Structures are given as structure tokens and as C-alpha cells.
């Protein structure tokens, strides 16, 4: 299961665009609310979450990928929540992927998870990518870590998530189907 962890103040495009692309790829993707079953984005869009973070933690369900959207104060809310640490721990035990965009890569960076990796984030938040090599482009994938610079990279970020969980062919077909190429 792909868990897109939303917190109040998340960046709408960074959560919804990858969700849409992952659904098109036939993946089991769900919004997981940090604080409740509904979370409000910084742009005013509220998502209905399949479950709360606490419910996912209690379920024992396998997490194939944990996706953290950026936006403020959403990314800060994720960074400060103990539930985020527990979901990181579960994802690690499952051998899953860790993905984050915009300000949210700081969550992994501040926990030392990006040391020795190539990663990116919104320019003002790159200082939190402790020990990482900053990528040249807007999307970086290094092993089980996928990061992106911001809202403008949300589509390419979503395609990279598909490449990680499925393959290049599936990502390319979806890109063509939505008239991106």
C-alpha cells in the first residue's frame, strides 16, 4: 500500500497529483490523515482520508511507500508528529520506499536518513538534508528514496513513484495517456 500522509496545511498539488497518477497505475494508494479523516490543504482543498495515521499504525498493514507532501505548515506538522516516526519505522521494516516533495524531504533529512544519498527539496529547505548530495534536477531517486523540489515537479515526482513501484513502461504509458508527452 502507498500511504500519502497528509497533515493540515499540506500542498494540494503535491498530494493530489501523485495520488492520481498512482491510481492510474493500478496501485493501492490512500490518503492517510495525520490528525483525522479529513485534512485541509494550504490552498483550501480538503481531502477525505481512508484512515488516520493512528489507524494505519494499529492495523499492521504493509507500507510499500510512504509519501510526504510539502506545503506549510503541513511539512512542519509531519516533522513534529510522533506518528510520522512510527510510520517511518513501519515502512523501513517493510523494506518500502520513502518519498517526499518540497519542504517535506526535511523530515527524512533531519532524521539522518538521507546521509550519503542524492536528494532535493525546496531550496529554502535543502539545509535540512544533512549529509545528502543535492541533486541537479527537480526529482531525485537514490535507492529507496525519492525526493522532489516543489509543486512544479509534482507530475514528474508522481511518475518516478510509479517507476519505483512498477516500471518505466507503465510510467511512460500514463504520461502519454494524460497528454504529457
Predicted feature residues:
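Catalytic cores of processing enzymes, dominated by hydrolases/peptidases
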Residues: 122
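Short, thiol/selenol-centered motifs that function as redox-active sites or metal-ligating centers
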Residues: 101-102
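Anionic-ligand binding patches
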Residues: 119
Amino acid at each position: 500500500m502507498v500511504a500519502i500522509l497528509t497533515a493540515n496545511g499540506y500542498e494540494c498539488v503535491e498530494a493530489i497529483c501523485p495520488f492520481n497518477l498512482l491510481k492510474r497505475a493500478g496501485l493501492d494508494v490512500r490518503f492517510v490523515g495525520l490528525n483525522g479523516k479529513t485534512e485541509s490543504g494550504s490552498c483550501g482543498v480538503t481531502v477525505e482520508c481512508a484512515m488516520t495515521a493512528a489507524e494505519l499504525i494499529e492495523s499492521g498493514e504493509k507500507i510499500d511507500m510512504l509519501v510526504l507532501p510539502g506545503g506549510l505548515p503541513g511539512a512542519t506538522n509531519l516533522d513534529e508528529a510522533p506518528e510520522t516516526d512510527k510510520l517511518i519505522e513501519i515502512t523501513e521494516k517493510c523494506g518500502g520506499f520513502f518519498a517526499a516533495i518540497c519542504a517535506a524531504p526535511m523530515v527524512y533529512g533531519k532524521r539522518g536518513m538521507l546521509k550519503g544519498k542524492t536528494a532535493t527539496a525546496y531550496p529554502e529547505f535543502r539545509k535540512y538534508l544533512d549529509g545528502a548530495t543535492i541533486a541537479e534536477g527537480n526529482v531525485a531517486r537514490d535507492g529507496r528514496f525519492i525526493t522532489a523540489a516543489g509543486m512544479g515537479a509534482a507530475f514528474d515526482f508522481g511518475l518516478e513513484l510509479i517507476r519505483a513501484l512498477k516500471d518505466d513502461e507503465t510510467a511512460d504509458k500514463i504520461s502519454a495517456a494524460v497528454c504529457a508527452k
